[in-house]
Amino acid sequence: MAAVRGLRVSVKAGGGAEPEPMEVEEGEVEAAADRASPREVVSGSNRRYENRAGTFITGIDVTSKEAIEKKEQRAKRFHFRAEVSDQQRNVVLDREMIRKAIPKVRLETLYVYGVDDMSTEDIFAFFKQYPPGYIEWLDDSSCNVVWLDEVTPSRALLNLSSMPTNEKGQRKKDGEHSSARSKKDRLDDSPLSSGDETEEGEVEEDNPSEAEDEDETETEKKSVNPPDTLSEAEQASLLKNELRPSSKPVKGNSLYMRFATKDDKKELGAARRSQYYMKYGNPNYGGMKGILSNSWKRRYHSRRLQRDVIKKSTFIGDDVEITPTYKHLHSGLVNVPEEPIEEEEEEEEEEEDMDEDDRVVVEYRDELQAFKREREGARRSAASNSDSDEMDYDLELKMISTPSPKKSMKMTMYADEVESQLKTIRNSMRSDSVGNSVKSRIGSKSHAEKPADVRLILEEKRQSTASRQQSSSGKSDVRQRLGKRPHSPEIRKTLSIAPTSRREPLSDVHSRLGLPKQLEGKGLYSDSKEKKTGSLWNRLGTAPKDKERPSEKSEKSPAAPEEEDSVLQQAWGALIKEKEQIRQKKSRLDNLPSLQIEISRESSSGSDTDS
């Protein structure tokens, strides 16, 4: 397809059909002219239509003062008086000033407007006095006329056009005055002794005396014709780059021209909107008139591509004496007539813009399949004939000249397909094994198990602690009231049984034990039988009321099962405080004198049963 994109189309001006006024499609560029010039390098999107009649370049600025003086001197030496034309004016333009006044100006190009129903040859005929190099068509109504120098366009602009309508009368007056003055000056002889200079074709005078007399008479007249000057209004109009109407109409059209700029370019899609092609025919598509559908354009490009390939194949076949027997990719279009095809009845698809690839090469699915089968058959035949040393030129030509399809299928072997299937199976098995290993490491819970509510768990703990407190409060343990000694065997047990029991600070041990005052002076260690026979509760006394409060709280706790979680936190805080208090009590009891209270286990067990 890359080879097709670079295809160039050249249309001859004298091919029977009228030359087209502009580019057909974007992306197609005509072959460059033989006489290449740096000034011909313009925008690549504009197509050039050269002047087949030829152009002319003087090489000098004929409007300069030096050129005018030399021209007058030659006319004087040869006694030649040229006919003065009123339309021709020798005006000197300051091109540097024009470049500064008009941005992006192209002094070698004139922009011409109003060329409707005019062909390329008609425009060249209008400028035949100043033959241009080529034309760049912009649309049906305008074009750019390009010269190969910067002097000729300015002369053509001034001599073939006039001032705008509002200043046309003033320009005519100035023109008449300047032309009359030029006529008068041209009749005078030159006083300069320029006869010493000799040029080719010059003839020396036989009578020098007569020549001297003529020189003396010439000194009294002015022979040098000064260049014409523009009026201020006309000069201002040129600097503004206003459209100047042509001096004479062409085919009933009034042309307007000015200096072209770099912004005067062909718009995209102008060929599809061209009314000239619809009326006079499109030479780039066989001279077809009317609206051309996209399908017709595709078939035309395919047929043209087929002809080019056949020409190349016949050229190679003549050299190697081998006649090509294969068919091209678009072989289904062989029977299409070379004459213009009639328009098909289609919907408004011709109004839609075509992509660049669709304009050049269009692929057909049926032909693509046939092309693939044809290639496979050619490869098999080439493999069968591989034992011969001769080259298969037919196959080589076919491979080179046939464009590759836009979307070519990737050829794979059966082993590659099997390997890809095995890879997919391995990847799927690997993903399953990885998932199972992760589950085994983490450990997954059974679906039957449901996460229990945290509130229910806290409620169960609260009820269990309440039941324990209630059971422990029923037994008023003597050891809790007496205080805990380091040598007591059941210290840890009592701590776990009654965690919420609070004790009175051990300020007075005797008052807690309930000893009589008369025994205080005798000492604590008396062997009297009255102490042993007395009731344990009489000697110990009753427990204070403060110690019974925890039991009441423990009884009320199960009655309020709907308390918040803060109650459990308070219980834990109380337990920590109790541990701290127990530690302090131990330290205090250790500092006091040792109390040897002999209490038998039987009496303690009996007291428990009595309570």
From Swiss-Prot:
The keyword RNA-binding applies. A motif (WLDD motif) lies at residues 137-140. It is found in: Nucleus; Cytoplasm. Keywords: Cytoplasm, mRNA capping, mRNA processing, mRNA transport, Nucleus, RNA-binding, Transport. Residues 1-44, 159-230, 338-360, 373-393, 423-568, 583-611 are annotated as: Disordered. Belongs to the NCBP3 family. This is Nuclear cap-binding protein subunit 3. It comes from Xenopus tropicalis. The gene is ncbp3.
